[in-house]
Amino acid sequence: MTNSKVDDFTRLIKTGGSGMKFTEGYWEKNERANASYAMQAFTAEAIPGGMRIVSPFREINDRGGALDVGTITTEFTSIRKDIISVRSYHYEGYVKGEPRYELNEDPQETEVEITDSEAVMKAGRMTVRVDLKDFKITYEADGKVLTNIGFRNLGYMQYDRATLTKFPEPNYMAAQYQPYMVTELSLAPGECVYGLGERFTAFVKNGQVVDIWNEDG
């Protein structure tokens, strides 16, 4: 390799190349991402217009297991006929930093049933089913399974995390990082994921690979 090619290769490795942002494949985590995944639907409750579950980053089997563990809260609500809105967050802040716009909502009646083994919300033809034993969220339409979320499919990422310090520094008693929420949905052979808005990718998102040649791309 020439020096320029070696530099390009080194840069590709350090930045994760054109692969996934948080993982290298399914099992290997990117060294720049500190990942925490929802491992259990520990609590479930009905809320106005839907239901809410709280999922810790590890299974809680006794009181000691509830110490020093983060959580992801997920809310399911009906915003229009046959549409279920899903919102997941980790310790919601007072200030909304992400771009938001007003939605044209027409909330419908929902039915929520919570047992020892599962929590179910029905909104028209749509149903969301949460397994309270083994973490799994299943979405159904007219009784047919559409997709689901399971092991390591819902997570909170701390990207480029710098540990805190007790010295008078900018990160005094506060770790510095870029926070992200991630989720993955199961797909059957032949199913496609579509998307709009990106200028440099295909309309069908399955298995996309994005090559960027300019460093400022």
Segments and roles (model prediction):
Residues 17-62, 68-119:
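A low-complexity, Ser/Thr/Gly/Pro-enriched, surface-exposed linker/loop concept
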Residues 6-13, 19, 66, 89, ...:
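Catalytic and substrate-binding clefts that recognize carbohydrates or anionic sugar/phosphate headgroups
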Residues 2-4:
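Accessory regions of macromolecular translocation/handling assemblies
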